[in-house]
Amino acid sequence: GGSPVVSISEELRYVDAYLYILSERYGERLSVEKDIDESLLDQAVPRLILQPIVENAVEHGVEKRTNGAIVLRIFAKKHLYLEVENDGVMTDQDRENISRLLSWDGTSEDNETRMGRIGIRNVNRRLKILYGEMYGLTIEEIAPESILARIMLPLTHAQGDLNV
């Protein structure tokens, strides 16, 4: 139902609703920080690309420790970036799963659905189909105990200073 594309502000409403549910569950254990370039709020993005990323971050960053922090950033630098950073440790198994999930080559589903990781795989696939191979989702450990999921999209129209 509805348009497959929404504004960032609408997408953030989904995320906020989801974060609200999480705050009910985790209370003080979860801290969320946002750093969002307000001038980008009317940029178009595919519906429901952020929530699975936030969900993944919480699952890895908060579930497994006494408390966790998530930072959500949205900014433009020639392209549009939506980032979710969480504190957490990536095991070798995580790295392997992630690289398998994100290296989708257009072929069969295999067994990802039962791994419950369909969210991040789907996001990456949708972005590549919609915008081309150079765009999509990456997830990497950027420092010990810090994991960054980054969605890169084309900017839908000139906005702010893009030559930053």
Please provide the spans of the model-predicted regions.
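C-terminal end segment of the histidine kinase catalytic
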Residues: 142-164
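Two-component histidine phosphotransfer core
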Residues: 1-140, 146-148
